[in-house]
């Protein structure tokens, strides 16, 4: 058995605690992250839960549990589609109505209806649908009505978050962006940051969307999504890969020639973006998405070995240690992505390294992750949301499960490729 017995046994004992029944205005069963997030449906959190639990459900050889996981995985998607608004908007999170009994629908939807522009469901909706469908060998649970909802979802992204001039997607603001306080977006002007996190995962979302529409008999729309993906990849290479530092950065797209009276009548701003040269773990995501060139991937591998920036015995610091914003203190709302170890970041960089044949680096990330969680479980009796990159000590939010299960994926994927 390639799994850590300590981690596997803990997850087996606690797995069902995150499989939630319908509650409040949430009509379908769903998976929550555990800990303080109990009873709410989250966008990318549910994706990574399903990503980890589906292969594990096969390994456990418990048919009833596997069927239950699949039911809850589908429920994640159905709940999100249930609260899609007429313009295609889908919220990032659906809170349990018991959180605020005055609400008749998700808070984010209420804000959107009131004309407040908000970020929307991160680009993991089609990825989760494709993940489930490929696992069970069936896409037909997504019917014609749901396909139209997916088209409206992509339309909403294009209309509200796509900057055609630069060919990249932007966060509207810094609310619920996944990496809560990523300094490339946190505290910056609205609609100004084309975040490498958002754009890397969007290439994967467009690919998954194309797979869904192909499987369900709409090759024309699938082709449109594939073409958009290729254009986006070109823009990421052109705008986000820094030829000086050999690293992928988020970029500032709020760059224009601002004329005033008779000033600035000559050569204007001809560049489309400015690099936000902050070394964040998300700079490695083009390797996860499979869009980095071999040369870019080799440069990223070298960055991973930069001890002053990303060195840790427990994985990858979410922000380079030599950035002035580096901070590992406990904070909630926003959670802290300014350097602590997060298992989802460890997995994404692990998988990217494995994609490009860098097995040694993948093994080191896996070993650090196993070391981290085994020690936490033995010492505290549970897993936490994020960790100190120097000591491996948990920072906060005990009882967190969610993407920490990805450590088992790491072990299995290394074993599968031997």
Regions found by a protein language model. Give the residues of each.
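Acidic/polar, glycine-enriched structural segments that form the non-catalytic walls/loops
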Residues: 1-38, 139-141, 151-159, 213-214, ...
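Active-site acid/base region of carbohydrate-active enzymes
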Residues: 2-14, 68-91, 97, 133-196, ...
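Catalytic cores of carbohydrate-active enzymes
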Residues: 3-6, 87-94, 159-170, 201-294, ...
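Short acidic-aromatic active-site loops that bind/stabilize oxyanions
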Residues: 4, 8, 13-21, 39-40, ...
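Carbohydrate-binding/catalytic loop surfaces
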Residues: 24-40, 90-118, 166-191, 245-282, ...
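Aromatic-rich carbohydrate-recognition surfaces in CAZymes
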Residues: 39-170, 196-199, 203, 280, ...
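Short, conserved charged micro-motifs
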Residues: 297
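Non-catalytic C-terminal accessory modules of carbohydrate-active enzymes
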Residues: 301-310, 319-324, 334-335, 348-418
